[in-house]
Amino acid sequence: MLATLQIGIDSKDKNSINYSQGSIFHGLIMEKLESDYVEYLHNLSLNPYSQYVYFDKEKDNFVWQISTVTKEAKENIIDVLVESIGDRIYLKHNEVSYNIKSKSIVGIKTYQEIVDSNFLQKDSDKKNIIGIKLLTPTTYKANGEYQFFPSIQALYCSLYNKWNAFSDKVSLADEEVFKHILEHSLIIKYNLKSYKYCLENVRLNSFIGNFSVLLKGPKELVSICNMLLDYAEYCGLGAKTSMGMGGMKIE
């Protein structure tokens, strides 16, 4: 099961919350969850959730977005936060409080539904060019270093691994499929800037902005790529997605 909790945060100052505070909001989540579940999460190699904060110009407020990719994670994270977060939140690290404007659970889907929405489309409806807007700084690790420019292989690898770890219906555990995905995907344009993301006194290389991916090859492969990029809206893109990085949406 996939689900997203959107929490509207009221702030008169548009600069009062910055990207690097994602780790502070992560700490607030951990404070709200049951201690046994927190320990369980700390022992996982892949997290079944992502979270980040960004400013929504249309709503004119900050949005704290928490997404989960399993039923268990929804019950233990999203459902708990809905009940435990009231009209205000307090960030101990900054010693600041914010009013909560709204809370809503959106985008509830099963894995089968996200598969069907991509594989049962008419060929004319399939996207061969996908625009990706990065809502928060994004990174991945290569050769022991965090990077400041997107790599098709690194970004797909993260999505591919998370899908196979958490999907309860459809497995993509086939090296040939992954190889074909890489061969038939290409970044064709981008408008990005580098960003130093502060995480626990460490400044990570990252990037933020927009880029587009061209999908080639047979229609089944295009469907898989569309499906994985749809999935990225829940699990995040790249590394440190539980710490506020890798927030994205399809344009």
What would you call each of these model-derived segments?
Residues M1-E251:
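RNA-interacting cores
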